[in-house]
A protein has these predicted regions:
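Hydrophobic membrane-insertion alpha-helices, especially the h-region
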Residues: 1-20
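Non-cytosolic head/periplasmic domains of membrane-anchored proteins
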Residues: 82-144
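Acidic/histidine-rich, surface-exposed loop or edge segments in extracytoplasmic proteins
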Residues: 30-43
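Ser/Thr- (and often Asn-) enriched beta-sheet segments in non-cytosolic proteins
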Residues: 24, 76-78, 133
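Intrinsically disordered, low-complexity segments enriched in small/polar residues
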Residues: 12-14, 62, 130
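A structural signal for short, hydrophobic beta-strand segments that form beta-sheets
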Residues: 20-28
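Mature extracytoplasmic domains of secretory-pathway proteins
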Residues: 40-110
Length: 144
């Protein structure tokens, strides 16, 4: 019983540590109204990802000048885990960035979060677990 309790405490402590690590923005790559943000330590839960966006969207605008909406108001920001860092294209499932003039300009495709806005409508959040809408009243609604 004590061993089970100890294991539970270790797992809870590890989860707590994972949730408290600060997000590190490694790089931002842009193409028109699309941006790819390479991150380490991104929040694990949908709620954590959306809350991180809401807390840091002004910092992203000030420091990286993203999002850059098109003339119709569209933009897309995709957050990718930086994982093993930049690599050569080699593997079939990598995202490469043409703004880097080197052969080592790709990452493994591991998108963890996306923020999209279409035609000045509501903002859409996309995660592995679902899609959410941030309406004009700042309410977050899970899409079915």
């Amino acid at each position: 019983m004590a061993l089970l309790l100890l294991a539970g405490c270790v797992v809870a402590g590890y989860w707590y540590w994972l949730c408290l690590r600060p997000v590190e923005i490694v790089a931002v790559h842009e193409e028109d109204n699309h941006a790819s943000v390479l991150v380490k330590n991104f929040p694990l839960t949908d709620k954590g990802k959306i809350n991180w966006w809401r807390k840091n969207k002004n910092l992203l605008k000030e420091k990286y000048n993203i999002p850059k909406p098109s003339s119709s108001g569209n933009f897309t920001i995709i957050f990718w885990l930086f994982g093993d860092g930049y690599q050569e294209e080699g593997k079939y499932d990598r995202r490469c960035f043409d703004d880097m003039k080197t052969k080592v300009n790709c990452i493994d495709k591991n998108a963890v979060f996306a923020v999209r806005k279409y035609h000045n409508d509501d903002i859409i959040f996309a995660t592995y677990e679902g899609r959410y809408t941030l309406d004009k009243n700042s309410n977050i609604i899970k899409n079915e």
